[in-house]
Amino acid sequence: MSENELTSGDFTEQNEPFALFAAWLREAEATEPNDPNAVALATVDKDGLPNVRMVLLKGFDSQGFVFYTNFESQKGQEILSQKKAAMCFHWKSLRRQVRLRGLVEVVSDKEADEYYKTRARGSRIGAWASKQSRPLEGRFALEKAVAEYTARYALGDIPRPPHWSGFRIRPLSIEFWHDRPFRLHDRVEFRREVPEGAWEKVRMYP
């Protein structure tokens, strides 16, 4: 795909951000060599200092963007405290970026249970064994915990840990960016005051 292939009419005239995101993600799934659903997640601590890390988007619809994590981790604690977060997708193969930010809610137990059951058995054991974001004396301590939980759940199903679930970001803004020559990029932002509100679309200077 050439850098001039996408014209302004290809996406800047779209009025439904979730449909536009779905289309862009589908294209990324066909062109990105690794994890097209990888996204930078930004949170802030109690002092207002930001933290950012990569996570995997595990679902989205008109209600928001979903990912899963250990709620006792740094990001889990910061989100539970602040109830706000931001994301940034960057698809180098497509020369595109999507930024969003908004309010965060916890997914239902049913939704978390259903996703948890789809994870590899080793990943489900890891959710029990890892005290995410806390000091680790050495690799052996982690491997020992994995062995202990593997033995504990050798027979039958592995339940979802009470500290492991999902968050849904209900976006208040979503910005779509596409690279153009000479830094004259296309940028369109969708904004709303509340998660249930109507979108306002604004074209932005690059």
Swiss-Prot record:
Pfam families xrefs: PNP_phzG_C (PF10590), PNPOx_N (PF01243)
Pathway connected to this protein: Cofactor metabolism; pyridoxal 5'-phosphate salvage; pyridoxal 5'-phosphate from pyridoxamine 5'-phosphate: step 1/1; Cofactor metabolism; pyridoxal 5'-phosphate salvage; pyridoxal 5'-phosphate from pyridoxine 5'-phosphate: step 1/1
SUPFAM superfamilies, per the entry: FMN-binding split barrel (SSF50475)
Keyword Flavoprotein: yes
Positions contributing to FMN binding: 53-58, 68-69, 75, 97, 132-133, 177, 187
Catalytic activity: pyridoxamine 5'-phosphate + O2 + H2O = pyridoxal 5'-phosphate + H2O2 + NH4(+); pyridoxine 5'-phosphate + O2 = pyridoxal 5'-phosphate + H2O2
InterPro entries: Pyridox_Oxase, Pyridox_Oxase_CS, Pyridox_Oxase_N, Pyridoxamine_oxidase_dimer_C, Split_barrel_FMN-bd
Biological process (GO), any one: pyridoxine biosynthetic process
Coiled coil: none
Sorted UniProt keywords: Flavoprotein, FMN, Oxidoreductase, Pyridoxine biosynthesis
Domain of life: Bacteria
HAMAP family: PdxH (MF_01629)
Subunit structure, as described in the record: Homodimer.
Family membership: Belongs to the pyridoxamine 5'-phosphate oxidase family.
Protein name per UniProt: Pyridoxine/pyridoxamine 5'-phosphate oxidase
Species of provenance: Rhizobium rhizogenes (strain K84 / ATCC BAA-868)
